[in-house]
């Protein structure tokens, strides 16, 4: 038995499912999950000493690569001053200043501890600011595990929300309306049904939790127009896309201005951090200046914020996003060529430093229904073949892949060669 397998067996006796987040259990691909001992640059090393080129990147935060010296030093320096104070610190002000400079739609920002806290808080703020209760989200888009957002569509796009998890009261979930991603007509119909009841629309600008599905050109501008028409707030969830697809986020890449933005992952540099911000007048509704309550004992933790601040300073350097995009494009082109040579139907979606692989005969993948129609069994086989070749992809057909600045020509070449051999065995 491998050391990873031994650790997993022990963990299953102590931790629900043996993991602290479900996707880590490899349920989407089968087999025993890797237990990681260390990471550096573009590579992970597991508990058995095996090395892998990593395209998970801790599910997005590691845009610079693992164990980046600037982030490591920032954490070490911060630890010397203390771990947590429960009081304001200078680094919070610096971080807020940097975020407002990099993302122009954010005029005021509050730090929290996770992406889930960020989305949960923006929904509460939108409801409190507008005095409305209903929320529109999109099928296949994930916004954390807050009760009101763990909802999917019923038999039709405008069916009242049905909980996706036990423990979410139906009476609460009914305030969440689920529309089809990239389908503006379904959103207009929702607004027509509830013209003065919808507080906000929350959307992943690139849907990264149904693999990687970019918006159609008219989708995000159309959401902005519908929100303006019906007096709702537009919330762009950039927990995954923020500072990855473009320096100013997907909202800069696609030129759309939200009322509120959710951030996470990269802004922590690998530490647990989230944030939300937006129009000053909306953010002023938060306590202590307004009536909408939001708080957190560890919010703005000085060690975590120091890591995130160092990460953003590096990400903001000239040429970073051009490099991410170029390397992701090289990987995508190599994978497509290898798949074509093996006669394997494959679609590769990509935006900036994000990408997604879809085993499908369809020429495009633009919505959740397209994703569901893909060959998941073929992906499972491909995942394990790649893992055996030293390449670690997301262990789910419904999760995006992530490029980092540490992925160089050698890593991409090895990945494409491994993929060619794997495609030949599918």
Swiss-Prot record:
Binding partners and assembly: Homodimer.
Requisite cofactors: pyridoxal 5'-phosphate
UniProt KW Cytoplasm keyword: yes
A GO CC term attached to the entry: cytoplasm
GO MF, one annotated term: glutamate-1-semialdehyde 2,1-aminomutase activity
Location(s) in or outside the cell: Cytoplasm
Source lineage: Bacteria, Pseudomonadati, Pseudomonadota, Gammaproteobacteria, Enterobacterales
Protein name per its UniProtKB record: Glutamate-1-semialdehyde 2,1-aminomutase
Pathway info: Porphyrin-containing compound metabolism; protoporphyrin-IX biosynthesis; 5-aminolevulinate from L-glutamyl-tRNA(Glu): step 2/2
Keyword annotations of the record: Cytoplasm, Isomerase, Porphyrin biosynthesis, Pyridoxal phosphate
Documented EC number(s): 5.4.3.8
Catalysed transformations (reactions): (S)-4-amino-5-oxopentanoate = 5-aminolevulinate
Family: Belongs to the class-III pyridoxal-phosphate-dependent aminotransferase family. HemL subfamily.
Protein origin, superkingdom: Bacteria
Leader peptide range in chain numbering: none
Modified residues (N6-(pyridoxal phosphate)lysine): 265
CDD domains: OAT_like (cd00610)
GO biological process: protoporphyrinogen IX biosynthetic process
Keyword Cytoplasm: yes
Main location: cytoplasm
